[in-house]
């Protein structure tokens, strides 16, 4: 029996090693631009880094103990979680005990809004947001309205920025929460979260910001911007999918999300996803180590593509702010061209772009973000989003520009 178990164990290890060998061969091909695809949808998700996978592997195969157990084998799993928590906290300038692990950005947004409102119900029932938030925020607030909460939706200007004056004017004694995203997932516009935080603090209102698109792209030092709650998602910064975190400033009133065990300081029960937590912690370290270099590199690539497209293709409009914009985001309207048809033509050339948020790409309605900017429905339907990342190369953008020129010309002839 023991011999059979040993043989089975070795066979399992051999299979795992074969899988990893194949995975890393594919990964190296992608990293060396040998992939058949030009991937320009980094706002939807990012490829997991090789170093992240290597960090995660032992927690699938060898170090599998439940971190809630008290024996030494389990303490190693708990220590790994603590290390990841500390690594993430360092990137934001906060305390490790203020970081709570979740299943991703959507859960973090839901928890921040629903459970702070629940904890603050005796103070008031008014929440302020903007019209261009991610649907994880907007749909949650729609539910809040259905159960008696009042929500103010701030307009944005043509670049996608809120008015600080309108924000301050919207605050009243019943206001308990402001939730404004750090940077928009469709147009890349960065909101003035430092000023928003100061306004919220002056009025004694909690401030939550959805940092899913911004984290890893711009420096964020939470103590300086008076943020009480901050959401992020691992797969947006080269970590695994299905894992995220919520920063909750110490002493911020918030109710527990899940009932059960004592995990996450009794606020989110359930056995931790150790491997993914470890992977996200590693990804957070890596992306912040290279952030300054990547911001410059990606900004140059972004500006190169925008300049060439605007110069070489007629009737093109850039959406969002050029100055206050994420370094990897390009959102373009090609007048007289259906965005979905353009996406399909680019896909036939193995170029991956988006018509908007990946979370809503199957919906037939125009982008609520673009409509809030003042675009017509026709213009909104004529828009694509290109987002670049660490593996994007200038040669890929050159090929994309040529494909865009040909595709747009062909589609305009047919319209």
Go through the PLM ranges and name each one.
Residues 11-14:
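N-terminal, intrinsically disordered, basic low-complexity segments enriched in Arg/Pro/Ser/Thr
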């Amino acid at each position: 029996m023991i011999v059979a178990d040993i043989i089975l164990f070795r066979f399992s290890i051999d299979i795992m090693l074969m899988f990893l060998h194949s995975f890393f061969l594919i990964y190296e091909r992608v990293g060396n631009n040998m992939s058949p695809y030009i991937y320009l949808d980094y706002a939807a998700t990012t490829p997991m880094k090789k170093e992240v996978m290597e960090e995660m592997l032992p927690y699938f195969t060898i170090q599998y103990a439940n971190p809630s157990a008290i024996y030494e084998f389990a303490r190693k799993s708990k220590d790994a979680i603590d290390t990841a928590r500390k690594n993430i906290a360092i990137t934001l300038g906060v305390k490790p005990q203020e970081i709570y692990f979740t299943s991703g950005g959507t859960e973090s947004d839901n928890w921040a809004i629903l459970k702070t409102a629940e904890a603050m119900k005796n103070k008031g029932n008014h929440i302020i947001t903007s019209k261009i938030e991610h649907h994880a925020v907007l749909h949650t607030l729609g539910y809040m309205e259905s159960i008696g909460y009042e929500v103010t939706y701030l307009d944005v200007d043509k670049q996608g920025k809120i008015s600080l004056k309108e924000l301050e004017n919207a605050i009243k004694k019943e206001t308990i929460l402001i939730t404004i995203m750090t940077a928009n997932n469709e147009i890349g516009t960065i909101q003035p979260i430092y000023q928003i935080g100061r306004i919220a603090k002056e009025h004694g209102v909690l401030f939550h910001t959805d940092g899913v698109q911004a984290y890893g792209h711009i420096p964020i030092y939470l103590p300086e911007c008076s943020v009480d709650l901050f959401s992020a998602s691992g797969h947006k910064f080269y970590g695994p999918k299905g894992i995220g975190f919520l920063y909750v400033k110490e002493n911020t009133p918030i109710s527990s999300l899940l009932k059960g065990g004592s995990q996450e300081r009794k606020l989110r029960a359930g056995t931790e996803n150790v491997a993914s937590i470890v992977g996200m912690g590693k990804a957070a370290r890596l992306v912040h180590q290279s952030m300054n270099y990547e911001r410059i590199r990606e900004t140059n690539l972004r500006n190169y593509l925008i300049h060439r497209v605007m110069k070489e293709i007629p009737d093109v409009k850039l959406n969002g702010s050029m100055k206050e914009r994420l370094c990897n985001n390009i959102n373009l309207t090609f007048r007289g061209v259906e965005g979905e048809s353009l996406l399909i033509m680019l896909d036939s050339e193995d170029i991956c772009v988006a018509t908007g948020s990946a979370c809503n790409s199957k919906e037939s309605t125009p982008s609520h973000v673009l409509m809030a900017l003042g675009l017509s429905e026709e213009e909104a339907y004529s828009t694509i989003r290109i987002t670049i990342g660490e593996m994007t190369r200038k040669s890929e953008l050159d090929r994309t520009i040529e494909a865009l020129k040909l595709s747009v010309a062909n589609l305009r002839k047919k319209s």
